[in-house]
Amino acid sequence: IMQTPGLIVKSIPEYDRISGWQVQAQNDGLLTDAAGDSYDFLFYESMTERTLFDREEGFYISAQNRTAQWEEILSAYGFSGQEISDFIEFWDAKLEKEDYIMYPQYTETVDEAMPVEIIPAPEHLIRMWFGFELYDGQQYQEAEILPFDRTGYTVVEWGGMIF
């Protein structure tokens, strides 16, 4: 898996700036590298250009009810139970206990921000980041949820950023 190496600032496992991540995916999603180490997912933090991201359509996420809201939204998109749990664990710790607008960013936008090459190419590549912006009464349009197609060899990436 190759991404734009200059943009990656942190990764697990370590991202090789020449060859990328060299992992083999099993049918159950487990990833194994050449050393035999296994991973449930690949993690990275990156520097990205915020102006690429849409802030027109989103979801109001209340501080008091965000876990249930995230579960409902992510489930409707088609994220797995484990992906939803990982998302909640990661973002609940990162965000202040405030209300947010959560703006979905789809594969095309994420590809612009952080290009990726996967060999062999998956049948379905689902890359979804969410932009989080503190809610202060700003106008937004409710985002429409279009469930993904996860049939066959599918790669799913989720992530986000705080605006």
Model-derived features: positions:
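Protease-labile, long low-complexity intrinsically disordered regions enriched in Pro/Ser/Thr
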Residues: 1-163
